[in-house]
Amino acid sequence: MHQTHDIQILPAPVIRLIEELNRLPGVGPKTASRLTFFLLRAPDDLPLALAHALTALKQQVQLCSRCYFITQGDLCAICANPARDQRVICVVEEPLDVVAIERTGVYRGLYHVLHGRIAPLEGMNREDIYFDELLDRVRAEPVEEVIIATNPNLEGEATAFHLQRALAPLGVRVTRLARGLPTGGDLEWADPGTLGSALEGRREM
């Protein structure tokens, strides 16, 4: 639909939902319109359940105080699990990267989620992500190895370089995922087999 003309004939609540959905990543005006009209036709319980789920998401989910993954309590399920290997920390950019690595079934250590990457052109620097918090953990916890699993793109490699340089004086083994992941891609889209092989074949930095 033509946003400048056709949308003006719609009721205000419909326009508002289209505009809000259009703010989501990967959702353009046409998809936002289709979703809005689908919800308009749907039984009342579906939009209401969706609204409740969105409210619960923002009110009940927070960041783990240790690794910055997502949780409903103070510690996430991974940090709270005594069976996880406390000696190894895998550093990732985003929470979805944790989900991708867990899907491989080959990793049993802990995580540290940066919530971003070092990208000066985007205004993202070391102090804008959970970079120094990782260094504090390595100093305070019985960590022997840090696996750097940032994305295989320019920003991810730059972040890995800065991490390696900061970790070097702390006396821990620093490794990087093996080559084989699609260059320029995101970890979350890697298939479990390829990602698992990259973990098992990780190399010293």
Swiss-Prot record:
GO BP annotations listed: DNA recombination; DNA repair
The keyword Zinc-finger is annotated on this UniProt entry: yes
UniProt-recorded Gene Ontology molecular function terms: DNA binding; zinc ion binding
Zinc finger (C4-type) in chain: 64-79
Alphabetical list of Pfam families matching this protein: RecR_C (PF21175), RecR_HhH (PF21176), RecR_ZnF (PF02132), Toprim_4 (PF13662)
SUPFAM superfamilies xrefs: Recombination protein RecR (SSF111304)
Toprim domain location: 87-182
Keywords: DNA damage, DNA recombination, DNA repair, Metal-binding, Zinc, Zinc-finger
Domain of life, source organism: Bacteria
InterPro entries xref list: DNA_Rcmb_RecR, Rcmb_RecR, Rcmb_RecR_Znf, TOPRIM_dom, TOPRIM_RecR
UniProt-listed PANTHER family: RECOMBINATION PROTEIN RECR
Described purpose of this protein according to its UniProt entry: May play a role in DNA repair. It seems to be involved in an RecBC-independent recombinational process of DNA repair. It may act with RecF and RecO.
Family: Belongs to the RecR family.
Protein name per the record: Recombination protein RecR
Species this chain originates from: Roseiflexus sp. (strain RS-1)
Organism lineage string: Bacteria, Bacillati, Chloroflexota, Chloroflexia, Chloroflexales
Gene that encodes it: recR
